[in-house]
Design a protein with these regions (language model features):
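Asp-box/WD-like beta-propeller blade repeats and closely related beta-sheet repeat scaffolds
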Residues: 43-135, 148-165
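Loop-centered beta-sheet repeat module
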Residues: 163-206
Length: 206
């Protein structure tokens, strides 16, 4: 393609805060690698940026996550017309047909695994080990509607054959669709309040 999506920041060597803004843009490979600014984001991290990407099946529509008030949202822009709309939930992974996304709770990820979530909005379930209203959502990218399809409470209720993790704090991360969009995978992670107990899981299987 002609354009390479990219982000621009004015600092390094520290973690972003909820007030740090990153510039969203693209590099024009057919015009001397000219930088073209498209917008900004207040929902980003060094590990995964703001999930900036082209929507599959189109060469003109891109999306990225941002913060709006007390919510993490997703901006969808047509880079040819600059028309932009917002859907009320940040995305994580897109289906190959570009019609759907799955996502997790970036507030909780930031609390449990700083660097992978987004700073700036605290997790309302910080003290809840496996909340019923947090988990993985499926998002219709055309309408913006979303549905919680599996909660942390549901996943934590599945018995662990190796250990009783009823006292552990649970979260989801690293979502990814398969190649035909019929399924997706995710990591279910948990942490015990006892650091020595957590260490038992750090090198499972070598």
């Amino acid at each position: 393609g002609r354009y390479v999506l990219s982000m621009q920041t004015d600092f390094q060597h520290r973690s972003p805060t909820g007030d740090d803004v990153i510039k969203i843009g693209m590099v024009d490979l057919e015009d001397g690698c000219k930088w073209i600014e498209l917008g900004k984001s207040e929902a980003w991290g060094w590990q995964q940026g703001c999930q900036l990407q082209f929507i599959p099946g189109t060469d003109s529509k891109v999306l990225w996550n941002d913060k709006e008030g007390d919510n993490f949202v997703c901006r969808i822009m047509d880079i040819k017309t600059r028309e932009m709309r917002t859907i009320p939930r940040a995305v994580y992974a897109l289906s190959p047909d570009g019609k759907w996304a799955v996502t997790t709770d970036y507030r909780r990820v930031n609390d449990t695994r700083p660097g992978y979530g987004y700073a700036g909005i605290p997790d309302p379930n910080r003290d809840v080990l496996a909340p019923e209203d947090s988990g993985i959502w499926r998002i219709n990218l055309e309408t913006g509607e979303s549905e919680l399809i599996i909660s942390l409470a549901q996943i934590a209720a599945i018995p662990n054959p190796l250990d009783d993790y009823s006292e552990a704090k649970h979260w989801f991360n690293h979502l990814l669709y398969n190649t035909d969009g019929s399924r997706f995978e995710f990591l279910h992670r948990w942490r015990f309040p006892d650091s020595l107990r957590n260490a038992q899981y750090e090198d499972v299987g070598g």
